[in-house]
Amino acid sequence: MHDIRLIREDPAAFDAAIARRGAESASSRLLALDERRRAIATELQAAQTRRNEASKAIGQAKAQKDEATASALMAEVAALKERMPALEAEGAEVEAALDAALAAIPNLPAADVPDGADEQDNAEQHRWGTPPAFAFEAREHADFAGPLGLDFEAAAAISGARFAVLKGGIARLQRALGAFMLDRQTAAGFTEVIPPLLVRDEAVFGTGQLPKFAEDLFRTTDGRWLIPTAEVSLTNLVREQIVAEAELPMKMTALTPCFRSEAGAAGRDTRGLIRQHQFEKVELVAITTPEQSDAVHEAMTKAAEAILEALGLPYRRVLLCTGDMGFTARKTFDLEVWLPGQGCYREISSVSNCGDFQARRMNARYRPAGESKGTRFVHTLNGSGLAVGRTLVAVLENYQQADGSVTIPEALVPYMGGIAELRPA
């Protein structure tokens, strides 16, 4: 959500910023609604004031036996009482239209975000690790993980496409990955949370998935939404809250199932675990002040990178361009892991600084130190630390052996009960 006051102050700058996101000029439409809203509010306030004055004057006129004046004032009060509900209704309608228009516009990009249309225009920041060299032709995980316990056919029979059943060693490996990630992130200062998986409209609106991306979500018959990411539940913990500056930054992590319809991804990544309707992810969320925001963003990104490095998985960090960023983000770093079977880097984490965009939608504020009354909107940040299923894919492909077995990364062996290798059944 955007601050209409800032748009009033510099409409040209606002239009220039959203143009970088590929959005059409909006300031004229927004300011017209804002002007009408304020005019109605002014007229309503004047009507209320005049009604009170006239009501008081009626008593005075009657006390003076001036029935003509009293009658005229009574007629005026009656007209005002009839007019005011119409003004209130019109004001509510205009305000709703303004709020809806503001809610449909993406966040403004930070100054250092590169302009661009899509992922081809993203800016690589750095790389870590060297892609493994195999003495055999590397395969995609879907081509060799079946004998390890990965079963797409059984899942399809139960649930349809884009689901998987994991059994035996590969199921244990996924569980180990999630536990390993949680342990690392809590050691990095994130508080573990077990949040709800079903949320209300207000929660999904607050983090920006509604109303624009409803088709990408699953909704229950009673009107709740399955979370597409724990970002929704964690970030909404501060909705309608005022926290003390001393409590910031608040850093939270959660391992949850996530659910996405992938309506906009038809035909993409139809094989394997890369794009599923149901998957597990360790989410990182931070609530902080504007002054700390950039530093927290960097620290969160490094916390995600540390998982990849501990697992020995080659990756690169890219700064997303304006055309590839998510709706709520003002700046996003993607971490892309090397997948030998595909011969390319694929996204495994996206860490975003949303500024006060989500906070305005949620009315999430903090009270600066030393102030007893004033409040400011918090900044919210979120990222994957990491996507468990995609990390499983990366481990399978980077540690695959010619005989179809998979070596367990050293850091995971304790989480596997000492098992150092997965072998085909």
From Swiss-Prot:
SUPFAM superfamilies reported in the protein's UniProt record: Class II aaRS and biotin synthetases, tRNA-binding arm
One term under GO cellular component: cytoplasm
Localization: Cytoplasm
Gene3D superfamilies the record matches: Bira Bifunctional Protein, Domain 2, Serine-tRNA synthetase, tRNA binding domain
CDD domains, per the entry: SerRS_core
Record has Ligase as a keyword: yes
Superkingdom of the source species: Bacteria
Pathway noted in the entry: Aminoacyl-tRNA biosynthesis; selenocysteinyl-tRNA(Sec) biosynthesis; L-seryl-tRNA(Sec) from L-serine and tRNA(Sec): step 1/1
Enzyme Commission designation: 6.1.1.11
InterPro entries reported in the protein's UniProt record: aa-tRNA-synt_IIb, aa-tRNA-synth_II, aa-tRNA-synth_II/BPL/LPL, Ser-tRNA-ligase_type_1, Ser-tRNA-synth_1_N, SerRS_1_N_sf, SerRS_core, tRNA-bd_arm
Family note: Belongs to the class-II aminoacyl-tRNA synthetase family. Type-1 seryl-tRNA synthetase subfamily.
PANTHER family to which the protein is assigned, alphabetical: SERINE--TRNA LIGASE, SERYL-TRNA SYNTHETASE
Domain notes: Consists of two distinct domains, a catalytic core and a N-terminal extension that is involved in tRNA binding.
Role summary: Catalyzes the attachment of serine to tRNA(Ser). Is also able to aminoacylate tRNA(Sec) with serine, to form the misacylated tRNA L-seryl-tRNA(Sec), which will be further converted into selenocysteinyl-tRNA(Sec).
NCBIfam families named in the record: serS
Protein name (database record): Serine--tRNA ligase
Species annotation: Rhizorhabdus wittichii (strain DSM 6014 / CCUG 31198 / JCM 15750 / NBRC 105917 / EY 4224 / RW1)
Record gene name: serS
